[in-house]
Amino acid sequence: MDSKESLTPGREENPSSVLAQERGNVMDFYKTLRGGATVKVSASSPSLAVASQSDSKQRRLLVDFPKGSVSNAQQPDLSKAVSLSMGLYMGETETKVMGNDLGFPQQGQISLSSGETDLKLLEESIANLNRSTSVPENPKSSASTAVSAAPTEKEFPKTHSDISSEQQHLKGQTGTNGGNVKLYTTDQSTFDILQDLEFSSGSPGKETNESPWRSDLLIDENCLLSPLAGEDDSFLLEGNSNEDCKPLILPDTKPKIKDNGDLVLSSPSNVTLPQVKTEKEDFIELCTPGVIKQEKLGTVYCQAGFPGANIIGNKMSAISVHGVSTSGGQMYHYDMNTASLSQQQDQKPIFNVIPPIPVGSENWNRCQGSGDDNLTSLGTLNFPGRTVFSNGYSSPSMRPDVSSPPSSSSTATTGPPPKLCLVCSDEASGCHYGVLTCGSCKVFFKRAVEGQHNYLCAGRNDCIIDKIRRKNCPACRYRKCLQAGMNLEARKTKKKIKGIQQATTGVSQETPENPANKTIVPATLPQLTPTLVSLLEVIEPEVLYAGYDSSVPDSTWRIMTTLNMLGGRQVIAAVKWAKAIPGFRNLHLDDQMTLLQYSWMFLMAFALGWRSYRQSSANLLCFAPDLIINEQRMTLPCMYDQCKHMLYVSSELHRLQVSYEEYLCMKTLLLLSSVPKDGLKSQELFDEIRMTYIKELGKAIVKREGNSSQNWQRFYQLTKLLDSMHEVVENLLNYCFQTFLDKTMSIEFPEMLAEIITNQIPKYSNGNIKKLLFHQK
């Protein structure tokens, strides 16, 4: 071979560095190096260049030495030393090695021929590099150093070889002695030139096979730990990526107060509060808002500021943020240096970075008193369930030393409970119409009475009347008003009594010396409690329309069919009316059905007589507003005899001038006028109910006449009319049964009326009906 000087390339032709993307790849220090031992170096910083092992061809990899990490002293040419030690002719930088491409050896297969090689220049250059990079100029430049260590003689054995034997070795993978001399130990898969360097005991290399440069975080350039070098070594964590985030323990920085009131913070002045996030392993340490997890550690990072009232006063609460795990979602750990600070999990204060130390000390001196006893009392939080506030009270009522004035609401609660309406249970506004009711029920009752509305319940006359559902059923609401005792006469009586009292007061003031003058009280007062008659007024059915077409010529068949259809609807209304009568539903169900079957014709005929008496003075038969039987229609075949019986009822009502209250009581007694011969299942209750309405009829007579000598006479006349109704109804039923059984007449009957007639015919034919009469014939 030629002289060694011819192998040295120009200094200006050294290639530039390429940033590595992966760790643990085989590296070639210079592109002019085409053979020799291939060295694998674990990446120590992102500035190392690493070659990929994806193909079989050897790739070029360059190492860059930053200016900040190497001294300005002239160093021996490393390329020259490597070239001379390997015995390769490199020539110029563009010179190519002739022959086939060199095979890229796999890991663990590199071997060299035994011998000795002079590596003094390489050792001197690497030693100089070690001395220059052992003490970096600053922490940041030391972290970005390209190569910070070199292999020792113990790890890199000295061998003698020439170019031909070296190339033959790379192709055949055997040495000249026929054996495989391995460059690494058995437990190594790569050749580590930094193995013998000493590292601190806290190095992460303890968990990475004694190599501190195999951490995944050192590959990314943004993950450098250079800002934490030197004085920030206490921030380094020991562990691997599988460990949980551990809280950072820092020296106690609890503020203390001197005797003169000055604040002394024990935290070192050189400890700064970085705003950027710093990654170590798989964890991030930063200051960020979150939910407090109470831990008793003396670190000062951020200040708790609560919106609204100043809950902890103007004092600072020392809270430290430890770590955020980015693997499983955000998870915050905080420390609080005050033992008296209690925080619930659902409270989320907003954290702000504390101001600089001078401002913090000024706030402390301004808000905190002097004395050592104040060191531990930084304020107490008060949340729901907590009762103590030492500072920053949001209201005087929360302070134990400030007595709030007595509340008026406490005295109101000790008074009597609010009065409720007797109708709908709403809050009563006063006594209206003799009953304690609300304003809504007062107006409703007045309109119902003065408007003479005939309400009808769509249910069973037992609807619930309360504040919410009082408008659903006016019939049940009106009935409840009457049951409570509401009466329009109560207001008039109250006015009369008030006027009499005022007149009496004036007389007593004029003649105070006369003790004989006393308050005048009327002898009789109207009854303020609800009566059965008033309830009967409420439940009275409305007048129904027949739907008769008067434009079509009249006929007996057409009129009778229309009357039957109207009668069927009136029977349905009579059933609802009977169930609404007080006491009727207390009877047995079979008794109720029996009474309705026996009395349905009584009710129809008596109501027809009342309408005829009120509208036509007993001259016409007013079945419905659109169906009135006049004298002309009475002349139709089979009509006159039946109309004559019905006109008798209206004429008697007209002769006696029966009042509406008397009519209602008489109509109810007609419902109870016929029973089976064997009696009812609830006979005793039936007799009691019947006697009750007989008394009601007597009360109605007394209310109308007012003279006891005439009351008995009128009672006799009215009861005599009730007894005569049996004969009228018997004649009407005979004709009805005849038309029902005679199919040649083709008179239609509604379904319900046909069912009643079918059940009633056998009973009348067998004589199983007992008439309840007031007078003997």
Swiss-Prot record:
Residue ranges with Low complexity bias: 141-150, 394-414
Positions of the UniProt region annotated as Disordered: 1-23, 130-183, 394-415
Residues that bear Phosphoserine: 45, 113, 134, 141, 203, 211, 226, 267, 404
UniProt cross-references to CDD domains, sorted A to Z: NR_DBD_GR_PR (cd07172), NR_LBD_GR (cd07076)
GO MF, one annotated term: sequence-specific double-stranded DNA binding
Domain NR LBD: residue ranges: 524-758
SMART domains for this protein: HOLI (SM00430), ZnF_C4 (SM00399)
Biased composition (Polar residues): 130-140, 164-174
Pfam families: GCR, Hormone_recep, zf-C4
Annotated zinc fingers (NR C4-type), start-end: 421-441, 457-476
PTM sites of type N6-acetyllysine: 480, 492, 494-495
Main localisation: cytoplasm
Covalent crosslink: Glycyl lysine isopeptide (Lys-Gly) (interchain with G-Cter in SUMO2): 258, 277, 293
Compartment(s): Cytoplasm; Nucleus; Mitochondrion; Cytoplasm, Cytoskeleton, Spindle
Gene Ontology biological process terms, A to Z: cellular response to glucocorticoid stimulus; cellular response to steroid hormone stimulus; chromatin organization; positive regulation of transcription by RNA polymerase II
Residues bearing PTM Phosphothreonine: 8
DNA-binding region: 421-486
Keywords: Acetylation, Chromatin regulator, Chromosome, Cytoplasm, Cytoskeleton, DNA-binding, Isopeptide bond, Lipid-binding, Metal-binding, Methylation, Mitochondrion, Nucleus, Phosphoprotein, Receptor, Steroid-binding, Transcription, Transcription regulation, Ubl conjugation, Zinc, Zinc-finger
Family: Belongs to the nuclear hormone receptor family. NR3 subfamily.
Comment block on domains: Composed of three domains: a modulating N-terminal domain, a DNA-binding domain and a C-terminal ligand-binding domain. The ligand-binding domain is required for correct chromosome segregation during mitosis although ligand binding is not required.
Assembly and interaction partners: Heteromultimeric cytoplasmic complex with HSP90AA1, HSPA1A/HSPA1B, and FKBP5 or another immunophilin such as PPID, STIP1, or the immunophilin homolog PPP5C. Upon ligand binding FKBP5 dissociates from the complex and FKBP4 takes its place, thereby linking the complex to dynein and mediating transport to the nucleus, where the complex dissociates. Probably forms a complex composed of chaperones HSP90 and HSP70, co-chaperones CDC37, PPP5C, TSC1 and client protein TSC2, CDK4, AKT, RAF1 and NR3C1; this complex does not contain co-chaperones STIP1/HOP and PTGES3/p23. Directly interacts with UNC45A.
Protein name listed in UniProt: Glucocorticoid receptor
Gene designation per UniProt: NR3C1
